[in-house]
Amino acid sequence: YAKITAKTIIDIGGGSESSGANAYFYDAAEGLLASTILLLAEFGDKNERHIVSVFKLIQDLLAKAQPDSKAKAKTYSSELMEKLPPEHKAKWLAGAALNTAEQTMMSVMSTALSRLNSFLDTEMEQMLCFGTAIDAEKFCTEKSAIFIVLPEEDVSKYFMVSLLIQQLYREILAIADENGGKLKNRVMFY
């Protein structure tokens, strides 16, 4: 689900669809986000597997490693990817960002960070970092309903509803794809 999550985050406000000449940066940022999510899911501690950790890791990877006296300085992200085996999926997902000039890579990382900025808020962090009771597979197989209640006085969090619905919908589509294009039960959104 790393690719689904990355696409949902990049598509905030239109994402790559409304990017025009900047489509490369949004597409590469989506791959970088998916790669980072995958790395944290595989190597991160259980309490580090959340969106704020993704932001922090990308921010840390923006820094340059200390150059070897004879070699050109590399970014930490390049060094990290070199440590992975060639067939590692995180390497493939980040390929567009990794196989480009250093300044372009920095722009891709900045694009990813700008999309993640929406999630840097204490209340948002509490919602996102400490698990959720929503399970797409369970939602598709058992009778269930999800009610989203938003405070009218704080409209700044409304974009989360859109993200939640997009994420759930994409996960449901992935589940349907795994089952020959069909779900066991009918799923409806109102």
Can you annotate each of these PLM segments?
Residues Y1-Y190:
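P-loop NTPase motor domains
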